[in-house]
Swiss-Prot record:
Native source organism of the sequence: Homo sapiens
Family (UniProt): Belongs to the CDPF1 family.
Coiled coil: none
Protein name, per record: Cysteine-rich DPF motif domain-containing protein 1
Ranges of biased composition (kind: Polar residues): 114-123
Domain of life, source organism: Eukaryota
Pfam families, sorted: C6_DPF (PF10170)
Ranges where the record places region Disordered: 102-123
Length: 123
């Protein structure tokens, strides 16, 4: 019976950028039922719905370390570079990030280009 109590959602996580919503069961750096796992940031966590293993969990998101906006871990909403940053804050402060982060952000923005030889394209 105790295991049912710890799986109950505490609330609903909602990303302020993409509006992803999901029930979360824990907020912090050390999710329940983990032996030595410590997350690098205060995170909103839910039990992994794809497994019956109670030790498995999914990190939904965290607060942006600059603006405190609640954002999911999706690559279109945030990135983690020693701390969580929402992409609007990354873009506003792009020169404060290393070249590798800037290149990664450019790759995210670039539309995928199809060549005529790829399936699904018309010539």
């Amino acid at each position: 019976m105790a295991s049912h109590v710890e799986c109950r959602p505490l609330g609903v996580f909602e990303c302020e950028l993409c509006t992803l919503t999901a029930p979360y069961s824990y907020v912090g750096q050390k999710p329940p039922n983990t032996q030595s796992m410590v997350l690098l940031e205060e995170s909103y966590v839910m039990k992994d719905p794809f497994t019956s293993d109670k030790d498995r969990f999914l990190v939904l998101g965290s607060c942006c370390s600059l603006c405190s906006r609640l954002v999911c871990v999706g690559p279109e909403c945030s990135l983690f570079y020693s701390k969580r940053f929402c992409l609007p804050c990354v873009r506003e402060n792009i020169n404060a990030f290393p070249q590798e982060i800037r290149q990664d952000l450019e790759k995210r923005k670039a539309p995928s280009k199809r060549t005529p030889s790829q399936p699904g394209s018309r010539t």
